[in-house]
Structure formats: C-alpha cells, structure tokens
C-alpha cells in the first residue's frame, strides 16, 4: 500500500506491486511494457505508471499513467516497505527501514548520450519496436 503525493498534494492510495517513475529516456523501457507512454526526445517530463494495480470496488486508483512536469516531486510513503526494493536503472536497493522517499528530476545531473548516425528520433523508435 503506497500513499502517493505529487509536490506535497495527495493523489491516491495505491494498492499493487509498485510504481514506475521515469523520464523521457526511461519511457521506452520498463515503463513502456507497463502500458506507459513513450515520451518524445527533448521533453523534460516525468511519467508515473502503476505496476500490477489492484482495482475493484474497495480499492480504486488512477489506473492510467500520468505525465507530470519535470518540477513535480513524487513522494511515495508506506507504513511498511518490508521486503520492498527500489530499482533505479539497473541498480536495486533494499528499502526495509524507510517510511517514505521522494523522487525528482535533478537539474545538476544530466545523462549525456553518445550520438551516432543522424537518424530521426521517430525512425530510431520505429526500428526498436
């Protein structure tokens, strides 16, 4: 059970396996497999997608991915993250002793991509999928 706040404003109490939070670069990976949108290159956005949400009459959540401004702070909190993990790219961190954490885009750090042939973003995207 996760309480989800966006920039200190309550959004929902989520019941399910977890949440995927990504930027444009990560939108073509795990986020896409969850039914999230692929974000166009150059857009500074955050996308929040549910992982295996439980949806019935007593447990409702947004149920759809949500695209947010890069300035949005995503806070996830729970009474117990026992046996939970936080995955960041290919790294995994246990979060047993944590009650809440905040995810945000950091202006000081950017990923630099090696660029090869000049191929449009949409042609690259089309060749991947």
Kindly give the residue locations of the regions a language model identified.
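Catalytic phosphate-donor-binding core of small-molecule kinases
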Residues: 1-16, 28-129
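AMP-binding/adenylate-forming core of the ANL superfamily
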Residues: 17-22
């Amino acid at each position: 059970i996760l309480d989800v706040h966006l920039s200190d404003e309550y959004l929902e109490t989520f019941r399910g396996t977890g949440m995927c939070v990504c930027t444009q670069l990560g939108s073509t990976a795990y986020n896409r497999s969850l039914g999230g949108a692929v974000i166009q290159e150059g857009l500074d956005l955050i996308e929040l997608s549910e992982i295996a949400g439980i949806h019935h009459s007593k447990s409702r959540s947004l149920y759809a991915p949500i695209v947010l401004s890069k300035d949005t702070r995503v806070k996830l909190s729970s009474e117990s993250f026992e046996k939970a993990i936080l995955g960041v790219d290919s790294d995994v961190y246990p979060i047993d002793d944590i009650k809440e954490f905040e995810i945000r885009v950091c202006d000081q750090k950017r990923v630099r991509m090696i660029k090869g042939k000049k191929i449009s973003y949409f042609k690259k995207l089309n060749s991947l999928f």
